[in-house]
Amino acid sequence: MLEGLGSPASPRAAASASVAGSSGPAACSPPSSSAPRSPESPAPRRGGVRASVPQKLAEMLSSQYGLIVFVAGLLLLLAWAVHAAGVSKSDLLCFLTALMLLQLLWMLWYVGRSSAHRRLFRLKDTHAGAGWLRGSITLFAVITVILGCLKIGYFIGFSECLSATEGVFPVTHSVHTLLQVYFLWGHAKDIIQSFKTLERFGVIHSVFTNLLLWANGVLNESKHQLNEHKERLITLGFGNITTVLDDHTPQCNCTPPTLCTAISHGIYYLYPFNIEYQILASTMLYVLWKNIGRKVDSHQHQKMQFKSDGVMVGAVLGLTVLAATIAVVVVYLIHIGRSKTKSESALIMFYLYAITLLMLMGAAGLAGIRIYRIDEKSLDESKNPARKLDSDLLVGTASGSWLISWGSILAILCAEGHPRYTWYNLPYSILAIVEKYIQNLFIFESIHREPEKLSEDIQTLRVVTVCNGNTMPLASSCPKSGGVARDVAPQGKDMPPAANGNVCMRESHDKEEEKQEESSWGGSPSPVRLPRFLQGNAKRKVLRNIAAFLFLCNISLWIPPAFGCRPEYDNGLEEIVFGFEPWIIVVNLAMPFSIFYRMHAAASLFEVYCKI
C-alpha cells in the first residue's frame, strides 16, 4: 500500500493530479505529503534563508539610520525650544531643509526609474494607500502649501531682520509637499523587489523626515498655545505661576503691519492641518518600507465602496454633534480668559457637552461590539502591515489622552480645594478613558472581520465536485475524462450519484459538526450561503449608522484641541497640584498624540463604514 501511494505511475495518483490541475477551486487534490520529497528539495529553503539574511540586516541598519536622524533632529528642536546657547532657528531650519532636499533627490530617482520600467509587472499591496486615504492627504497637503505661502509672505514682511533660511524653508517645504503627494498617489501600494537595500534607506529617511517636520509643527503650535494660555492667566490674576512669554516675534517693523498681524494669526490656524499631513505621510511611507521585499499571497483585497444609503440616522446625529461642537468651541474661545466667572462657565459648558457626547459614543460602540459578538464570524488573521500599523497607532496615540486624563483624576483626588467645575472634570476624564477603550475594541472587531467574498471562497473550497465525462459537466472547469472520474471516486456507498452522471460530494462530517454548521449558517444545507451577519440587512444598516456616527463624532472631538479649546490648560487645578511647568510639559507631550488619535480613529471608522 505504501509503495502504491509513493509510486508516480499509480493510476490513482495520476488521476488525482489531473483533477487537481483542471478543476481549480471546485476540486481538492490529495495532500502533497503523499509524494516523496526529492533529496534536493531542502536546498532552496537553505538558500532562501541565506538570501534573507542581508535583507534583515538592511532592514535593521536602515531603521537605525532613521532613528539616529530622528534623535538628532529632536535634540536640535529641544535646543532651540529652550534657547540653548549657540543654537538658532536658522540652524534648525537648515537641518530640516537638508533632509527634505535629500528626500526630494531620492523620490525623483525612484519616480524616474519606475517610469523607465513602467511596462514591467509590479507587485502591489491592495491594502495600502486606499483612495480615501490619498484624498485626505491631498486635502491636507493643499492646506500645507497655503501655510507655506503665508510663511513666505511673513518672511517678505519681516525680511529686514530675518535670515534667508526662513524664506528658503517654506519654499522647499512646499515643493517637498507637492512632490511627496504625487509620489504617494503613484507608489504608495508598491512592493519593492529591486534595489531593496537602497530603497530601505530612502524610504526610512522619508519616514523620519516627515516625523521631524511633524515635531517642528507641533512645537511651533504648542508654543503659540502656551503663550495664549499664559496671557489668559495673567489677565485672571495668576501671573505668579507663569513664566516669561516665549515670544519669537522679529525685532523689526513689518512693512504693512495689519497684513503681517493677519498672516501671523492665520499661520497658527493652519498648523493643525499641516501636523495631520506630516503624520499621515509618515505612516503611508512606513507601510511602504515594511512592504519592501515582502512576499504577498494570492488573495486580493476586496475593493471597498462608499455607499450613503441607509445611514440617515447616524449621519444626522453626527452632523448635529459637529454643529454643536463648532458652537461650543466658538463660545469657549470667546469667554475663556475674559473674567473668572466667564471662564468657569465656559469650562462647565465644555465639560457638560463632552460628557454627553462621550456617553453617546460609548453606547454606540458597545452596541456595535455586541452585534459582532453575537454574529460569531471568523476573523481575518492574515499578515497585513497596514492593518497592524493602524491597530498600533490607535493604542499608542490613545495613551496620550489617557495620560492627561489620569493626571486630571489624580489632581482632583489630591487637591485641597475643589472649585465647582472640577467635579465635572472627574466624569469627563473617566469617560475619556473608557470611550477610547470601547471605540478601539469596535474598530479592531471591524477591521479584522473577513470580507464577504472571502467567506464565500472558504465555503466553496469545502465542496469537491467530480464530473462524469459521459454527460454534460456540472461546471465548466470539470474534466471530460470518464476514466478519471472512475479512478478518483471511492469504491463505496457513501457518495450518492447526482443527476446526469455528475457526482458532488462534501467533506465527511459527523452529525454534531453538521448540526453546528447548519445552525451557524442559518440552518440551510446550501454550502454557498452568506453569513448571517451579511444576510441581515437590518444589522448591516445598524453597524453602518454606528460607524458613520462615530466617524463624525471623532471629527468633532478633533476640532476643540486642534483650535485652542484645551480645558487641560485652563482649569488650573492640575497646575496647582503638579506645578505649572511639569503639567505644561505633560500636556505639550501628550496633546499631539491625543489630537492625532481622533483623526486616525476617524480614518479607521471611514474604512470600517466602507467595509460593512
From Swiss-Prot:
Keyword Ion transport appears in the UniProt entry: yes
Organism (species): Homo sapiens (Human)
Chain ranges on the Extracellular side, renumbered to this chain: 81-88, 154-163, 224-264, 335-344, 414-423, 564-581
Bias (Low complexity) ranges: 1-46
Residue spans crossing the bilayer: 59-80, 89-112, 131-153, 164-188, 197-223, 265-290, 312-334, 345-370, 389-413, 424-444, 545-563, 582-605
Protein name listed in UniProt: Proton channel OTOP1
Function: Proton-selective ion channel. Biphasically modulated by acid and alkali, mediating proton influx and efflux in response to extracellular acid and base stimulation, respectively. Sour taste receptor, which carries inward currents in response to extracellular acidification. Sensor for ammonium chloride (NH(4)Cl) in taste receptor cells. NH(4)Cl acts by increasing the intracellular pH, thereby generating a driving force for proton entry through OTOP1 channel. Might also participate in alkaline sensation.
GO BP term, pick one: inner ear morphogenesis
Similarity comment: family membership: Belongs to the otopetrin family.
Regulation of its function: Activated by both acid and alkali, with proton influx in response to extracellular acid and proton efflux during alkali stimulation. Inhibited by Zn(2+); this inhibition is thought to be pH-sensitive. Currents evoked in response to mild acid (pH 6.0) stimulus may also be mildly potentiated by exposure to Zn(2+). Activated by NH(4)Cl.
Catalysis: reaction(s): H(+)(in) = H(+)(out)
Cellular component GO terms held in the UniProt record: membrane; microvillus; plasma membrane
